[in-house]
A protein has these predicted regions:
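Hydrophobic positions on the long internal alpha-helix
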Residues: 4, 37-41, 55, 81-82
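Substrate-binding pocket helix/loop in short-chain dehydrogenase/reductase
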Residues: 14-15, 22-24
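Active-site loop-to-helix junction immediately N-terminal to the catalytic Tyr of the SDR YXXXK motif
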Residues: 18, 64-72, 84
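SDR active-site lid
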Residues: 91-159
Length: 189
């Protein structure tokens, strides 16, 4: 049995402007929705003695950027849940993996409203949004992401995290090093 959790919503803008309700909506979909679906399948997977759960997170789980803090917080929460669940469920032959793409052009970009230029932040959130949309729109080949999801779902020895970046992004070197350092340090404690 395989469950792939890929639902997500994203709001861009200053935290104080987006407000608590917006942050709660992001957590409801990105974290609690995934959590609920996952909890529905775990008993059946455990009963069958195997299973695979793949959570599509985001590089934003580790690389929070301005005007994206709420989204990053939800993806960080999902990454932590993914790693913890993988450790809990491994004895039952159930693996839980995360696939963390970096800014690909998906429907999440189409469903994200441009922030307002009104208020104390002026045009900064709008400029940031336009830059983000431009980068994402140039990355429409999702095959690296779907390949990572397929590997996470079917590889007998999957990685806990699949970091997926289009081409070569220097930031991924920093990202890979940070994740590896954190994992190595954790194993030593």
């Amino acid at each position: 049995d395989i469950l792939i959790n890929n639902a997500g919503i994203f709001s861009m803008g200053p935290m104080e402007v987006l407000g608590e309700g917006n942050l709660r909506r992001q957590f409801e979909t990105n974290v609690f929705g995934t959590f609920a679906l996952t909890n529905l399948v775990i008993p059946q997977m455990r009963e069958r003695g195997s299973g695979r759960i793949v959570n599509v997170t985001s590089a934003g789980a580790f690389l929070a950027r301005q005007y994206m803090a709420g989204y990053a917080a939800t993806k960080h929460a999902m990454d932590a849940i993914t790693i913890g669940l993988d450790l809990e469920l491994k004895p039952f032959n159930i693996r839980v993996c995360s696939v963390a793409p970096v800014q690909y052009g998906t429907s999440i970009a189409d469903n994200t409203a441009m922030p307002s230029a009104d208020g104390p932040y002026g045009d900064q959130p709008v400029d940031h949004y336009k830059e983000w949309r431009e980068i994402a729109s140039g990355r429409s080949d999702l095959s690296p992401v779907t390949d990572a999801i397929a590997d996470a779902a079917t590889n007998p020895n999957p990685k806990q995290r699949y970091l997926v970046a289009p081409g070569t992004l220097p930031i991924m070197d920093i990202f890979d090093a940070k994740v590896q350092f954190d994992e190595e340090r954790w194993k030593q404690t």
